[in-house]
């Protein structure tokens, strides 16, 4: 009897896992970045991520949406498609870049490939 219940629960969980859509971050073309230059960031994550949370706390930054994408150690890519503009890390378009590249808030991944 216990074995049947275990099989039933396992089947239900498997069905739920298959039916649940995966969370996907959208990627925008670089031309849609209206907040300034596209940034090349060493890493990105959310305010829930341990290292990012520590960095935000040290800077005294309170993020209203803990699920919003945050760029870390960012520098602007000023000329996209001009041959020299490249980023081996993550390219992001961010709304709030006033922290001297340490962090950038409200980011969306962008595609700089042509």
UniProtKB/Swiss-Prot annotation:
Keyword Signal found: yes
InterPro entries associated with the record: Hydrophobin, Hydrophobin_CS
GO molecular function: structural constituent of cell wall
Residues carrying sugar: 42
CC per GO annotation: extracellular region; fungal-type cell wall
Main localization category: secreted
Disulphide bridges: 33-93, 40-87, 41-74, 94-107
Record has rRNA-binding as a keyword: no
Subcellular location: Secreted; Secreted, Cell wall
Signal sequence annotation: 1-19
Keyword entries, A-Z: Cell wall, Disulfide bond, Glycoprotein, Secreted, Signal
Subunit note: Self-assembles to form functional amyloid fibrils called rodlets. Self-assembly into fibrillar rodlets occurs spontaneously at hydrophobic:hydrophilic interfaces and the rodlets further associate laterally to form amphipathic monolayers.
Family: Belongs to the fungal hydrophobin family.
Function: Aerial growth, conidiation, and dispersal of filamentous fungi in the environment rely upon a capability of their secreting small amphipathic proteins called hydrophobins (HPBs) with low sequence identity. Class I can self-assemble into an outermost layer of rodlet bundles on aerial cell surfaces, conferring cellular hydrophobicity that supports fungal growth, development and dispersal; whereas Class II form highly ordered films at water-air interfaces through intermolecular interactions but contribute nothing to the rodlet structure.
Listed name of the protein: Class I hydrophobin 6
Gene that specifies this protein: Hydph6
